[in-house]
């Protein structure tokens, strides 16, 4: 099975949601600044954008990185519409899109190599769901 297909990634969203701890999410949201810098390693379909909005994060900067160009193209084409259907105000531009006041940009490439470039002064949140099991953890921790 190819785990980098839009159909597979969308199908597993509900399973991923049920696997998340509400207590951990609430602790995260309590410590996240009002205008967070978020880096999503192995961003896939950029579902983190929808999750952030659903959790009340409507401002900040989101940067997603994925090695699979077709997945990033799919995310760019579909995530703004998904957010719009969920009631968000979405504005698209050539570089990405805004969901409410959350500026969203996606890049194709090696997530570990590009992670620090997104926010040279550091990110407030690094998301790496279903990613850290695919890379060397020590290499990942060295860049975050």
What are the roles of these predicted feature ranges?
Residues 131:
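Hydrophobic adenine-recognition pocket in adenosine-nucleotide-binding enzymes
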Residues 52-113:
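Class I SAM-dependent methyltransferase SAM/SAH-binding core
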